[in-house]
Every structure is written in structure tokens, then in C-alpha cells.
Amino acid sequence: QKLCERPSGTWSGVCGNNNACKNQCIN
């Protein structure tokens, strides 16, 4: 699964099917 990263550089969680953080997904 892909992790999501906030603009601040801190981990915010994982990208779910709802693509809540799709713009911040990184491998």
C-alpha cells in the first residue's frame, strides 16, 4: 500500500479507495 505525506513532510496515513490523499501518494 502507498503512504500519504502531508506538505509538512509528516506521514498522514495510507491512501484508501476513497483517494482522500491521492494527490500526496508516494511509493
UniProtKB/Swiss-Prot annotation:
Swiss-Prot/TrEMBL GO biological process terms: defense response to fungus; killing of cells of another organism
Top-level taxon of the source organism: Eukaryota
Leader peptide range in chain numbering: none
Keyword match Oxidoreductase: no
Residues carrying Pyrrolidone carboxylic acid: Q1
Protein keywords: Antimicrobial, Fungicide, Plant defense, Pyrrolidone carboxylic acid
Family per similarity comment: Belongs to the DEFL family.
Function: Possesses antifungal activity sensitive to inorganic cations.
Self-association and partners: Forms oligomers in its native state.
Name of the molecule in the record: Defensin-like protein 1
Organism of this sequence: Brassica campestris (Field mustard)
Lineage, top ranks: Eukaryota, Viridiplantae, Streptophyta, Embryophyta, Tracheophyta
